[in-house]
């Protein structure tokens, strides 16, 4: 069994054609009934699931690159999730913010960007929809391409929520440029772009919050803080 250095929370291994994950709980993850994901043909086959360990079919594929074709597939698959009417766990978005803020307070970390946007983020949390099934963690590293298919992996944070959050999360985590974002959203379908913008701000805030709450700061959050400020200025102009 070979250990895999992937993800930041669980302990992951590969054994032959199986992807084995020892679950590490943080109060926000592994709430979903993973068996319901068999409704989607872009999720690897679930072999077994227990409180301690989950085992998936190993997908031997390649990294997903941003092209018009891949953006189309990702958009269509997200739309399929959002329209599926599957019952996911209740929205965990406000709880995630509360928990990360608590950790920062315990560590004595004061981040000016986080403090500046707290009231604005709370307003987003109050008003966001909480009824649609979401992946909630769609980084490119949580996808794999094989035989013209793109598989979505790592569903541990899946919950009900606002579709604009899922879309914004992918836009920001994949660092789509303006043209790529437009292509992606056009493939998805009719949307309220003001809500996309609001949730892009929320996603950047959440990424900054998350990385500062970790025992090891895995990456520099400066680009995310600069992007957050930029999008907030865009939002203010939008309101005017």
Model-derived features: positions:
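N-terminal non-globular leader segments, chiefly Sec-dependent signal peptides
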Residues: 1-10, 113-116, 186-187
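ATP-binding pocket architecture of kinase catalytic cores
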Residues: 2-91
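Protein kinase-like catalytic core scaffold
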Residues: 18, 54, 132, 151-153
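A glycine-centered beta->alpha junction motif in the catalytic cores
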Residues: 52-67, 80-83, 99-107, 205-219
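Hydrophobic packing residues in well-ordered alpha-helices of helical domains and bundles
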Residues: 71-74, 114-117, 201, 224-228
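An alpha-helical support segment within catalytic cores of ATP-dependent transferases
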Residues: 86-136, 140-141, 146, 228, ...
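Active-site Asp-x-Gly
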Residues: 146-194
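Helix-rich C-terminal or lid/interface subdomains of diverse kinases
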Residues: 187-240
